[in-house]
């Protein structure tokens, strides 16, 4: 879910999510990178470690990026996402605090229900995307991006201090847990063997605390960043390796890294913060208007509401769209042109789709060019290639609902 751009020569892939150290061995100077509790586990299993958002994480393992991607779509893969910021918001004013920062209707969440939401600024720009869960234990569980760690923490802590100065009992705790994502059509079948809870009763975007393969105190949330069914497991750091090893004993499960995670999320039409959305992009421009709670729209009481609601009611100048493209792989920053050859926009993410066997991308174009089926051009290495505005997700998502 983040950020600078780097080429991985041996993968033939450019990952918008990864910073400039990607694809190079970590030097001694880079040893200051933070390590997840699974660092040694990754090395023992052939993980190729790269720098990402201040952390050392595996970009892939012994399997190729494409093999890992397809295994996730057909079976399930285990991802280490422990670099994500996990926080608890406690106190009677926890909902008030969160709703002062995000666009979603947090008050309407049922116990253990979560939602994707957005931190916004007064100009309507997106400061980060995050998942907020209203737990039955009486706190909000928040997961946000590693690349926005300091910014997000400062934002929430600032609001905590503001409310505390007014006599509120609200407080914030950073959750020092590992976070494992088990993703794919057989993920919950694998997990069910290690839990007493009936996972059929845990639909998409709901959460529960349970014992997982003998590890107590795990929060299991049915969500992910691949478009597949699956879970994210917040597990006490000291037990992370034990849990990962237990999951990996099932032949359905393989380890996967950042490379597969990026192409999976792009096929699913999911945004990468810092590339597809940023502080200068509004939810309407980013095609994320669905994150705006109905009550919040009416009250206009979130940061940037006047700008965002005006765009909802009027006409927005640009929109995020999906593109399917001919020719060479399309990368971020590639110009988008109309059929007359005039530059009208920019690609923000792109890769060859392992499932579709063609190039897919996201980018921003003027609203009049955003209708699916609109023919356009993209420029790759100074050559123009055909592209068509396409509906997202590019690959059908398989979220588990009870409907």
Curated annotation (Swiss-Prot):
GO biological-process terms attached to the record: glycine decarboxylation via glycine cleavage system
Protein EC: 2.1.2.10
UniProt entry tagged with the keyword Transit peptide: yes
Reaction catalysed by this enzyme: N(6)-[(R)-S(8)-aminomethyldihydrolipoyl]-L-lysyl-[protein] + (6S)-5,6,7,8-tetrahydrofolate = N(6)-[(R)-dihydrolipoyl]-L-lysyl-[protein] + (6R)-5,10-methylene-5,6,7,8-tetrahydrofolate + NH4(+)
Record's keyword annotation contains Transit peptide: yes
Single GO MF descriptor: aminomethyltransferase activity
Pfam hit, one: GCV_T_C
Keywords for this protein: Aminotransferase, Mitochondrion, Transferase, Transit peptide
Cellular localization per UniProt: Mitochondrion
Main location: mitochondrion
Binding site for substrate: 232, 261, 399
Transit peptide boundaries: 1-28
Enzyme class: transferase
GO CC field: glycine cleavage complex; mitochondrion
Family that this chain belongs to: Belongs to the GcvT family.
Annotated function: The glycine cleavage system catalyzes the degradation of glycine.
Subunit-structure text: The glycine cleavage system is composed of four proteins: P, T, L and H.
Protein's name in the database: Aminomethyltransferase, mitochondrial
């Amino acid at each position: 879910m983040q950020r600078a751009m780097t080429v991985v020569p041996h993968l033939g892939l450019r990952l918008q999510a990864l910073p400039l150290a990607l694809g190079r061995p970590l030097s001694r100077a880079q040893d200051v990178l933070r390590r997840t509790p699974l660092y040694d586990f990754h090395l023992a299993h052939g993980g190729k470690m790269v720098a990402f958002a201040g952390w050392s994480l595996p970009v892939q393992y012994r399997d190729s990026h494409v093999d890992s991607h397809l295994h996730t779509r057909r079976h399930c893969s285990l991802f280490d996402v422990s670099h994500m910021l996990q926080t608890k918001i406690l106190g009677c004013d926890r909902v008030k605090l969160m709703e002062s920062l995000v666009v979603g209707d947090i008050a309407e969440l049922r116990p253990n229900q979560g939602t994707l939401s957005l931190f916004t600024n007064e100009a309507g720009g997106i400061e980060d995307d995050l998942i907020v869960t209203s737990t039955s234990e009486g706190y909000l569980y928040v997961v946000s991006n590693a690349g926005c760690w300091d910014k997000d923490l400062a934002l929430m802590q600032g609001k905590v201090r503001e409310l505390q100065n007014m006599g509120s009992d609200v407080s914030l705790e950073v959750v020092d847990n590992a976070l494992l994502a088990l993703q794919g059509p057989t993920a919950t079948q694998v997990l069910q063997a290690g839990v007493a809870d009936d996972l059929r009763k845990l639909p998409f975007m709901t959460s529960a605390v349970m014992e997982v393969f003998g590890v107590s105190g795990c929060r299991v949330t049915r969500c992910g960043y691949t478009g597949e069914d699956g879970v994210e497991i917040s597990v006490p750091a000291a037990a992370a390796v034990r849990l990962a090893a237990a999951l990996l004993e099932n032949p359905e499960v393989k380890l996967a890294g950042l490379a597969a995670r990026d192409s999976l999320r792009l096929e699913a039409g999911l945004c990468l913060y810092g590339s597809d959305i940023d502080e200068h992009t509004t939810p309407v421009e980013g095609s994320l208007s669905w994150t705006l709670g109905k009550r919040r729209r009416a009250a206009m009481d979130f940061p940037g509401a006047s700008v965002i609601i005006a765009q909802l009611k009027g006409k927005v100048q640009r929109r995020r769209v999906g593109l399917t493209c001919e020719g060479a792989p399309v990368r971020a920053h590639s110009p988008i042109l109309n059929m007359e050859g005039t530059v009208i926009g920019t690609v923000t993410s792109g890769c060859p789709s392992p499932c579709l066997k063609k190039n897919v991308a996201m980018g921003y174009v003027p609203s009049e060019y955003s209708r699916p089926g609109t023919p356009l051009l993209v420029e790759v290495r100074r050559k123009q290639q055909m592209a068509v505005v396409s509906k997202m997700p590019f690959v059908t998502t398989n979220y588990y609902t009870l409907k």
